[in-house]
Amino acid sequence: MTRFDHFVEEALYGQHGFYSTGQRAGSEGADFITSPETSTLFGACIAEYLDRVWQELECPNPFVVIEAGSGPGTLCRDVFLSVQDCSDAIRYVMVERSDPQREIAFREVTTRCFMDQQEVPLAVLQDLPAGSFTGVVLANELLDNLPPRVMKKTEKGWLELHVEQGTEDWQTAPTEAQTMAAAIAPKAQNGTCLPLQLKSAVWINRALATLERGRLLVFDYGVESSDIFTQRPMGEWLRTYRNHQRSGSPYQEPGSRDITCDVAFDQLPGRPSICTQTEWLKDQGLYSMTDWARKQWQSALPSPDAAA
């Protein structure tokens, strides 16, 4: 019998885990897709943001950017291809637990962005670096892959999800876990379930600790109130993916599929400012970046051609 968060940790990051065996985001030959894989414009918007923050921080040199959960390096590549004002000051650190993806990422970024340079402003690490710095920590769809503990409300108190031979096994939760669940969702009805996202909270604290001055920028799917989880079936907020399709039970064939959980933003430390990704991209000038293409398409409507 294995506690659910420990089971997911092994299924994703263990020796034979989903990410350890080379699974990744992407359009072809991958199991899921994230914003950097849909368009280079996402990286261009990140670059615009980095340029602005660099100016707000009075142009520090070095200006350190840490990307956690960097995967195959797609976002890092697009940032280097787009960044302007802070290009000479930027020192980029990709943090990725998967050995295969770290190798792919370093090769992708160096060959696409620094082919003719003997030294590159780039490092690839397995974990967040020690010490503090001035810059930005960013993470795109990282927190949803940090395994949660899962609780269920019953007449006798809170139970905690374990996995036993590919099936659910609910056990009485430790006192401290019951206390946390009751505080987070005091109105939960019997039979409803709730994630405790302790690993996400720890990661946020670690990321903030690395910043002497700067910003923490996180993109993820989630909800502003944990109460929302108790109003939805567990299968709606705890999901699996394989070959770009929903992939059924997370307890079967561990290591063969991605396991993801919506993020409860109210369980994260601090007072995060929350907005939709669409709103954030608009603030970084996405519409102005696509204005030429939009006008080209509209002008070609009467007689469409390849340029449109």
Predicted regions: what is each one?
Residues 1-68, 72-128, 132-133, 279, ...:
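Rossmann-like AdoMet
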